[in-house]
UniProtKB/Swiss-Prot annotation:
Keywords, in A-Z order: ATP-binding, Cell membrane, Lipid transport, Magnesium, Membrane, Metal-binding, Nucleotide-binding, Translocase, Transmembrane, Transmembrane helix, Transport
Gene that this sequence comes from: tat-5
PANTHER family in the cross-refs: PHOSPHOLIPID-TRANSPORTING ATPASE (PTHR24092:SF5), PROBABLE PHOSPHOLIPID-TRANSPORTING ATPASE (PTHR24092)
GO CC entries: cytoplasmic vesicle; endosome; plasma membrane; trans-Golgi network
Residues at which ATP binds: 442-444, 524, 570, 575, 594, 623-624, 704-706, 786, 792, 816-817
Protein name (database record): Probable phospholipid-transporting ATPase tat-5
Species of origin: Caenorhabditis elegans
């Protein structure tokens, strides 16, 4: 014993070959031999009397780091680009000081790595995680003879397996990106040369200043200023769904000077220079100018976003010719491509915490073993060797198992026929779906269909609903026929209908003999379709003119032509749109405007009915728009034209200057024509879905930008507010005192469904953020109206801050929901007809709201429960073998000798047990039907009982018990040769692990049976082939089988009995419904 304490230790068993380093260190070799001799002489003396304790583990999942490393490498090894404006000349490229500037190439590169950086970056990404770094250090320590434990393959094998899978996955993903990039860079386009001829050019070879030709249904390869189209009117429609997610066609206008040229070759003969601002991210703004010099004549013109085609948009009509102003990384599409922050699931964080506990346990257990052995000058070597021996407590394969499981969950959700076209865009957080406590939902397009139907028009003195629209048509036709006085009621109705038919951005498209309408908003399409039903049809529209087809009482058709002078498009900031038209029959010039009542009420002449009727319509659940007009004299038009042109030519603050001119000169003293009401119908099965989610313990909040009355109406009709709810509407809050009073009023009520305007929310959060979180979260349902996109995200952050660790999900369908979706723990986007922004930004994409029930209650449950079981079994697998190792060391005087050698240790966690444990990802504790029928089952998941410190301790105790039984049992029943201890204990260990998996299964699947059979068969073959580890004659005897069976029965039977009794006398909820 004294000699052994003075020397360093190595690993071996008496009948196993010692793994000694090839180093010539005589001290180390002599120590190993001495240690082996002592172990061999002590085995028979210490087979009956010892007990030991062990531990349990979990591996840390890390989802946040990869993108950071990618950014780091780019920032370290790439030169910072300086963005600046540029002036390009048609046919000559950049001119002036820009002629010497090297602009970014037009190559598309989405690859993370190149051939040299691939291995270093991937390895860096992996070893920055503590778990992988820990195992790397353990593996490297095996090259030090003094602390070597067994064969290096024991430690390098699992680490190499994990790294190989990671490298293969990353290489495959990057190769797919490379192929996609190569296809885009190799696309062919036509370029105009100085002499006007066309040549073919690759997309990657396009440069700033090139004049290129883009045909219909082709991708725009760079940001170009539109010079000419084949459409006679000069209209060019583009699809922007790959840029901003919106599926409606956008109208783009070429430069008038070049559009009027006879053919495209004439463009190259112009002395034309285009100035473009420095590259920026805003896809809705562009500042530029165009200058054409012809002898002594200089023509200047302004350029805005309507004159530009952004890269990655698609030409939807005709052929376009444009000059390239931005390429490559300076294009709007690339500058708006941000790497979203990776989300980390709560389960991953819990597993990470358990991993830290296990690491601490390894240190404590190793320290105890060293202390029990006795401290001397070489204690640190003993400590290192014990840490190496017990390193299996921290299973390196856990992270790989969880990552593979997440990919399987994503595949399974994607092919669920009950929720078709569901897309998983973030495969790292499927378990989050199983623990949602708050669901924040948009209204329009999410709870409602975003299919608008015109329902009501109010003219101040009389209102017409859908059942009286035929009467409206009679009035309008009579007015156009000229039978009534100018100021009669019919004439007023005519003016209102005509204004609705003209004030929009709708374009009729004729395809295959049918007419369809393209517009940015479904509200506008609903209005135009309604005017058609009452006899005023939008016949045609181009950049400069619009025609209406009016049905007269005698059956004839009257065509009215209007010249479009100016269009002021709708934005979410202005909440209105306007148009100035000139009637070509009467030469009357009129400004027509429509918009939200909140902004239009301050622009129209005094009236006593607008606010009241807006509230009435909102209570009916209708979306309202105020329509108004203002006749303009020629002098007023000319004055506006001069001021507006001057604002358009400004380089800085152009948009603001233009808006100021419009507001100052036009948006005053408008004549109120009518108030329109459009209905947005509820999505299919919304009411039953909300009830199902509420029964599942999920609190549902509706966040909308609509009016208070409309929001309340939809909340009631959808079932968000139940009949028993006491609806509390927040009053006007302007200051801290108001907020304090309103919050006190709310505090005194119970079973409250809260309605809070966005303005009140802002004030309350400014002064009483914590109190708002406490009181609002206690409400049964919450509706926030007049909510901006920023406020939606702010509400999500409020819940995340004050209700952690409860999980928050957000669901929406539009661009205004993106910030909310990205801020939530789980973002769900609805793939809407009008746009894909929310769908593309979300973690999960569905096609309708009702699908969220199956996504959460079925797939969310399965993902969470399966990952919990998988994590605990991987930890159990490492704990049980470490328990056996600890007992083995204690029996033999705390020797740091490995119980199992080389291939056995590697195969234990891979070939023999990996498939059965991983097969738990197809287990189901309840059927999908029962999960939806009994939504109350979902409530229990939020408590986190499937993986908690309690369950962790239970599995630790199970591992300690089974490890002790197997190890002590093997020592008790073996006869003479120590190799029999290895055979019996390792066989009992493998069979116990397979039986434990089988005992955990709730619903058997063919993949589980196959995994069990393959693993058991592979191990039985190993018993025959690995004669260096097993005595072939012994393992084929009945003695071996009986001893192994007995030990396995003692380790598993008591646990089975306890489980059976528990299911009989205290069954879990899922067992009751089954």
């Amino acid at each position: 014993m004294g000699k052994r304490k003075k020397n360093d230790e190595s690993s071996s068993s008496s009948s196993q070959k010692p793994c000694v380093s090839s180093s010539s260190d005589d001290f180390s070799v002599s120590f190993v031999r001495a240690e082996e001799d002592d172990v061999a002489t002590t085995i028979r003396d210490k087979t009956a009397s010892l007990k030991s304790n062990a531990t349990h583990f979990s591996a840390a999942s890390a989802a946040k780091g990869g993108m950071f490393d990618f950014r780091c490498c780019r920032s370290l090894f790439s030169r910072r680009r300086v963005l600046h404006s540029r002036t390009v000349r048609v046919g000559y490229g950049p001119v002036g000081h820009d002629a010497n500037v090297t602009f970014t190439p037009n190559t598309v590169c989405n690859q993370k790595y190149n051939i040299f950086s691939f291995v270093p970056i991937v390895l860096f990404q992996q070893f920055k995680f503590f778990l992988n770094l820990y195992f790397l250090l353990m593996a490297c320590s095996q090259f030090i003879p003094a602390i070597q434990i067994g064969a290096p393959i024991t430690y390098w094998g699992p680490l190499g397996f994990v790294l190989t899978i990671t490298l293969i996955r990353e290489a495959f993903d990057d190769f797919v990106r490379y192929l996609r990039d190569r296809d885009l860079n190799s696309e062919k386009y036509e370029k105009l040369t100085r002499d006007g001829t066309r040549i073919e050019i690759r997309s990657a070879d396009i440069e700033v200043g090139d004049v290129i030709i883009m045909h219909k249904d082709r991708r725009v390869p760079a940001d170009v200023v539109l010079l000419r189209t084949t459409d006679k009117s000069g209209a060019c429609f583009i699809r922007t769904d790959q840029l901003d997610g919106e599926t409606d066609w956008k109208l783009r206008i070429p430069v008038p000077h070049t559009q009027h040229l006879p053919n495209e070759a004439d463009i190259m003969e112009l002395n034309c220079e285009v100035y473009a601002e420095k590259p920026q991210k805003d896809i809705h703004a562009f500042v530029g100018t165009l200058k054409i010099t012809d002898d002594d004549n200089v023509q200047d013109g302004s350029l805005n976003v309507e004159n530009v085609l952004w890269a990655n948009t698609v030409v939807a009509s005709g052929t376009a010719v444009g000059i390239v102003v931005y390429t490559g990384r300076e294009t709007r599409s690339v500058m708006n491509t941000t790497l979203p922050e990776s989300k980390v699931g709560l389960l991953d964080l819990e597993v990470n915490n358990l991993t830290k506990l296990l690491f601490c346990f390894v240190l404590v257990l190793s320290s105890v073993m060293v202390a029990m052995k006795g401290l001397d000058n070489l204690w640190y070597r003993y400590l290192m060797r014990f840490i190496l021996l017990f390193s299996y407590i921290i299973p390196i394969s856990l992270r790989v198992n969880l990552d593979m499981a997440k990919l399987f969950y994503s595949w399974q959700i994607g092919r669920d026929k009950h929720i078709p076209e569901t897309v998983i865009r973030s495969s790292t957080i499927p378990e989050e779906l199983g623990r949602i406590s708050f669901l924040l939902s948009d209204k329009t397009g999410t709870l409602t269909k975003n299919e608008m139907h015109f329902k009501k028009i109010h003219l101040g003195t009389v209102a017409f609903s859908s059942d009286a629209f035929e009467e409206v048509g009679q009035h309008v036709r009579s007015a156009y026929a000229g039978r009534l006085a100018k100021h009669s009621f019919s004439a007023k109705l005519q003016n209102a209908v005509e204004a609705i038919a003209l004030c929009h951005n709708v374009t009729p498209i004729f395809e295959n003999g049918e007419i369809s309408y393209q517009a940015a908003s479904p509200d506008e399409v609903a209005l135009v379709k309604w005017t058609e039903t009452v006899g005023v049809r939008l016949a045609s529209r181009d950049l400069h003119a619009m025609s209406l087809s009016v049905q007269l009482p005698n059956g004839q058709t009257l065509m009215k032509q209007f010249q479009i002078l100016y269009v002021f498009p709708f934005t979410s900031e202005t909440k209105r749109m306007g148009i100035i038209v000139k009637d070509e029959t009467t030469d009357e010039v009129t400004l027509l405007m429509k918009g939200a009542d909140t902004v239009m009420s301050g622009m129209v002449q005094y009236n006593d009915w607008l606010d009241e009727e807006c509230s009435n319509m909102a209570r009916e659940g209708l979306r309202t728009l105020v329509v108004a007009r203002k006749p303009l004299s020629q002098a007023e038009l000319e004055a506006f034209d001069r001021a507006y042109h001057a604002a358009k030519m400004s380089i800085s603050d152009r948009s603001q200057n233009m808006a100021n001119v419009v507001n100052r000169m036009l948006e005053r003293d408008l004549q109120l024509l009518c108030l329109t009401g459009v209905e947005d119908r509820l999505q299919d099965q919304v009411t039953t879905s909300l009830e199902l989610l509420r029964n599942a313990g999920i609190k549902i909040w509706m966040l909308t930008g609509d009016k208070l009355e409309t929001a309340i109406c939809i909340a009631k009709s959808s079932g968000l507010f139940s009949r028993s709810d006491n609806i509390h509407v927040f009053g006007n809050v302007h200051n801290r005192t108001d907020a304090h009073n309103e919050l006190n009023n709310l505090r005194r009520k119970t079973d409250v469904a809260l309605v809070m305007p966005g303005s009140a929310l802002n004030v309350c959060l400014q002064y009483y953020e914590a109190e708002v979180a406490e009181l609002v979260c206690a409400c049964t349902a919450v509706v926030c109206c007049r909510c901006s996109p920023e406020q939606k995200a702010q509400i999500v952050q409020l819940l995340r801050k004050y209700r952690a660790p409860l999980r928050v999900a957000a669901i929406g369908d539009g661009g205004n929901d993106v910030s909310m979706i990205q801020a939530a723990h789980a973002g769900i986007g609805i793939d809407a007809n009008e746009g894909k922004q929310a769908s593309l930004a979300a973690d999960f994409s569905i096609t309708q709201f009702s699908h969220v029930c199956r996504l959460l209650l079925v797939h969310g449950r399965f993902c969470y429960k399966r990952s919990c079981a998988l994590s605990q079994f991987v930890m159990h697998r490492g704990l049980i073998i470490s328990t056996m190792q600890a007992i083995f060391s204690c029996v033999f005087y705390f020797a740091s000798v490995s119980l199992y050698q080389g291939v056995l240790m590697v195969a234990y966690s891979t070939c023999y047990t990996m498939l059965p444990v991983f097969s738990l990802v197809v287990d189901r504790d309840v059927t999908a039907t029962n999960a939806l029928t009994y939504p109350e089952l979902y409530k229990e998941l939020g408590k986190g009982r499937s993986l908690s410190y309690k369950t962790f301790c239970i599995w630790v105790l199970i591992s300690l018990y089974q490890g002790a039984v197997i190890m002590y049992g093997a020592l008790l029943v073996f006869d003479a040769d120590f190799i029999h201890v290895v055979s019996i204990s390792f066989s009992a260990l493998i069979v116990t692990e397979l039986i434990m998996v089988a005992m955990t299964v709730h619903t058997w699947h063919w993949a589980m049976l196959l995994a069990q059979a393959l693993s058991l068969g592979l191990y039985m073959i190993s018993l025959i082939l690995f004669d260096q580890y097993f005595d072939r004659q012994f393992v084929l005897s009945w003695v071996f089988i009986s001893k192994t069976t007995a030990i396995t029965a003692v380790s598993c039977l008591p646990l089975y009995i306890v489980k059976a009794l528990r299911r009989k006398f205290s069954p879990p909820s899922y067992a009751k419904v089954n």
